[in-house]
Every structure is written in structure tokens, then in C-alpha cells.
Amino acid sequence: MSVSTDTILRLDLYNREQVLAAPEPRLVRQASVSFGRPTVHPVRADQFTGLHKLRPDLHRKQFLLVQWPFDLEKLPANRRYESMTVDIEFDNEAVVALDILPPAYDAPGPSDDETVRIDVRGVGRPRLAWDLCPVDPACGLRPRSRVMLVILDLPADVVRLTGTLGAKAVVARRRLGRFDTTTAESQTPAPFELGIDGTFAILPSASSGSPV
């Protein structure tokens, strides 16, 4: 699989922790997700099989396969990922997921097939998500390179897509011989712009996402 692995965005994930003598809980950074540059591949209508070929609106549509690489930050030895969710939401409600595929792998090593439970959400909608959980929580998720895959269904006259990236993780930390879990998430989704020609940019925002 040929996709760019250059880091273009890092989403820092925070939880809120109560501090003694502090009136309000404070934000504590727990982990991060780094995203590479997405690649775009046109999908022809004649490549479809089954019911998709019978759609009466095919002449008014275009379809794109988008590959989007991401990496989990490597955690200290006393911490592990017990789950991770990465989500994409498009601003144009006419841009929807025709199909969402489990993450592929852009680095050598064994696949997640037997060690990770993967759920995908959002077919037919402009908001889609990948949920990753280890089959054995005691092992955690490995911080390896993965690639999100989605086939988008959009109007034929659309040339540029805008939307946001977000992420959430459950992180376990060992304290005094036991693991405590906390949910950490990006504070504000990071806005982006993606052209059907593959051009891509992170847009200015007050987000906690950090362009690299």
C-alpha cells in the first residue's frame, strides 16, 4: 500500500483531573494520534458490483477511495491503550460513506486480525468512525501505523471537501500494582480541506490539533 506517512497533524488527547485545592479540574495530556497525508483514488461506477450498479443516480455521482494513515503515540511502560476511536465528519451532508473498511497496515508486522476488535460506523452518513479495542485488554493496542479506508459517495460537481478529524482513547495507567482507566479526547475536532485531486490542508482553528 502506497500512502504518505509524513505527519501533517497531531491531535493531543486530554482528560480532566481534579487537583487538590484547585476550584476546577485541569486538563491533562494523556496521549496523541498523528495523521499522515490522505491519498485519493477515483472509483468508476462500472467497478461496482451487485445493487450499487442498479442505482438510477450514478450519472449524478462520483466515488472516491480515500486512504488516511494514522499512528498512536507510544506510551510509557506503565500505560496502555484499551480502546481508540478515530472519526471524520464532512460538512456537506451530501458527502457520505458508501463503504467503510477496517484499517489496513502501512508498516511491516503481524496484522490486527486476531488481536484487535474493529468496528466501523457511518455507512450512508457524513460522519464515520473506526473503533479499535484489543481482544485482550491486558495487552492494549500496539502503537503501530494503520490506514483508514473509506469509499465516499458525493455529487458529481463537488471538487473540494471540508470536514473535521477527531479522536478519543481509553488509557489505562498502572498505579500501586493496579490499572486505572481514563477517557482522553481531542478538545476540538481539527478542520481540514480535501480536494478530489488529492490536495489537502489543515485549516486554522482554535483546536488542540497541532499541525506538524
Sequence positions of predicted segments:
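Membrane pore-forming effector domains from diverse proteins
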Residues: A97, A104-P211
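An N-terminally focused, membrane-permeabilizing/fusogenic/translocator signature enriched
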Residues: M1-P102, T199-V212
